Regions:
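Conserved N-lobe loop of protein kinases adjacent to the ATP-binding glycine-rich P-loop
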Residues: 46-53, 60-65
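Conserved short submotifs of the Hanks-type protein kinase catalytic core
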Residues: 117-131
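Protein kinase glycine-rich loop
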Residues: 31-37
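Activation-segment/catalytic-loop signature of the eukaryotic protein kinase fold
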Residues: 112-113
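AlphaC helix of the eukaryotic protein kinase fold
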Residues: 70-100
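Activation segment signature within eukaryotic-like protein kinase domains
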Residues: 151-152
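Catalytic-loop of the protein kinase fold
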Residues: 159, 163-180
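AlphaC helix of the protein kinase catalytic domain
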Residues: 132-143
Length: 184
């Protein structure tokens, strides 16, 4: 068990995810894949320079690519090259736009964006949080307005600021909204 981030290799890694302890940029150590979606994987990771846990987002749309023999690189499936390249460019552009918005506490801060292994990654602050879906389920399936209001007002303010800056967030859902340990 990692004393810095709580990572444990006991549970095994998700299929097609990067192997445990893969090193990226000779700096970031890959831990467990916390989730996957149509865009790729989200891992718990460790920044060996700053000695802090981080969250690593890997662009790896499994409908367009697969792991190469080295178990690290993305290999684009035949006929999917244009779609992969367009989506990769969109991932990088959106990540750069979000990284420029640093003054909003309701948005996870992006520390680094890079390309490696024929794909791209973002590195952001690690937050020990739960999804809104889990929070609501744990609360009996409902939230009263006096409970929901302090959770959603920062989100609405952040969305307003993002849209004013020309940045869209197209993936808002109970799975992507997260509640921190302090209840924010």
């Amino acid at each position: 068990m990692c004393p810095h981030c709580g990572f444990s290799a006991d549970g095994g890694q998700q299929p097609n995810a990067l192997p445990f302890r893969t090193r990226l940029q000779n700096r970031y150590l890959v831990g467990a894949a916390k989730k996957s979606n149509g865009e790729g994987f989200v891992y718990i990771g460790y920044d060996a320079v700053l000695n802090i846990p981080v969250e690593l987002h890997e662009f790896f749309p499994q409908s367009l690519c697969e792991r190469a023999e080295d178990q690290k690189s993305a290999r684009v499936m035949g006929g999917s090259e244009i779609a992969f390249d367009e989506n990769l460019a969109a991932f990088l552009n959106h990540s750069r736009e979000v990284a420029r918005i640093r003054e909003l506490s309701a948005i996870v801060q992006i520390y680094d964006i890079f390309e490696e292994n024929h794909t791209a990654y973002t590195v952001s602050e690690w937050d020990d949080s739960i999804t809104l879906r889990y929070f609501v389920e744990r609360s009996g399936g409902n939230l009263e307005w006096n409970e929901a209001r302090p959770l959603f007002m920062p989100v609405l303010s952040a969305l307003s600021a993002m849209h004013s800056a020309g940045v869209s967030h197209l993936g808002i859902s109970p799975e992507t909204l997260r509640i921190m340990k302090d209840g924010k």
